[in-house]
């Protein structure tokens, strides 16, 4: 029997609430970073298959900015924070104070790359802290890696590992709202627990697997 048969909507609701708790911590950290009021929320958390994941993002050929890191500790897995080019470009322009920044220059501009690294540290650290508090598991993120590529290429490595548990990923939608500039930034977090960690995570959340 698939381990996913025992996962109920309640467990996904818990992951969404964990996301909202983490979003509160992230908003405070980003407000300090940008020196203005930031609101964040997590509209939903879903468990999606590979095909659904690609459709959800609009196709494998969509160019994206990706922040990749590993979840380590009692659970292991891959985490991706993925944004369309224009959203990442908008965030970096705000953070480095350069309205002319072009996302294509990311690899040549240390300051802009550092901005996305910091975003990854904030989002992953806040989410994993909230998840660890709820499950009583020890969790922490690795150092983030930033890349620009097509969506399908970005997640292919993580999905190859995930194929052992049925090609499903946890999607946590994140909405970041800049009150001062009335701007919204959408970031999608894809969490791909390793084979041994997927069941452990949902058991910790109360699923009967």
Swiss-Prot record:
The protein's Enzyme Commission number:
3.-.-.-
Which CDD domains does this one have?
CheC_ClassI (cd17909)
Q: Where is the signal peptide?
A: none
Look up the domain of life of the source: Bacteria
Q: Name one GO biological process term.
A: positive chemotaxis
Q: What happens when the protein's gene is inactivated?
A: Cells fail to synthesize flagellin protein and grow as long filaments. They do not respond to attractants. CheC mutants showed overmethylation of the MCPs compared with wild-type strain.
The reply to whether Hydrolase figures as a keyword in the UniProt entry is yes
A GO molecular function annotation here is: hydrolase activity
Assembly and binders: Forms a complex with CheD.
**Protein function:** Involved in restoring normal CheY-P levels following the addition of attractant by increasing the rate of CheY-P hydrolysis. Is only 6% as active as FliY, which indicates that CheC may function after addition of an attractant to cope with increased levels of CheY-P whereas FliY may function constitutively to remove CheY-P around the flagellar switch to maintain an optimal level of CheY-P. In addition, it was shown to prevent methylation of the methyl-accepting chemotaxis proteins (MCPs). Inhibits CheD.
The family line of this record is: Belongs to the CheC family.
What is this protein's record name?
Answer: CheY-P phosphatase CheC
Q: Which organism is it from?
A: Bacillus subtilis (strain 168)
What gene does this protein come from? cheC
């Amino acid at each position: 029997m698939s381990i996913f048969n025992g996962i109920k909507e309640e467990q996904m609701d818990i992951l969404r609430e964990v996301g909202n708790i983490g979003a509160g911590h992230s908003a405070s950290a980003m407000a300090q970073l940008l020196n203005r009021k930031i609101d964040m929320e997590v509209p939903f958390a879903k468990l999606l298959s590979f095909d659904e994941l690609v459709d959800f993002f609009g196709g494998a050929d969509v160019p994206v900015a990706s922040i990749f890191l590993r979840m380590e500790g009692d659970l292991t897995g891959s985490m991706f924070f993925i944004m369309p080019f224009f959203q990442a470009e908008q965030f970096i322009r705000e953070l480095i104070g350069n309205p002319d920044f072009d996302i294509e220059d990311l690899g040549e501009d240390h300051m802009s790359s550092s901005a996305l690294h910091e975003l990854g540290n904030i989002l992953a650290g806040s989410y994993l802290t909230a998840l660890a508090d709820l499950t009583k598991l020890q969790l922490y993120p690795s150092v983030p890696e930033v890349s620009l590529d097509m969506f399908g290429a970005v997640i292919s490595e993580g999905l190859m590992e995930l194929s052992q548990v049925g090609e499903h990923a946890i999607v946590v939608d994140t909405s970041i709202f800049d009150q001062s500039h009335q701007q919204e930034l959408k970031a999608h977090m894809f969490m791909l627990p390793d084979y041994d960690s997927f069941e452990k995570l949902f058991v910790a959340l109360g699923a009967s697997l």
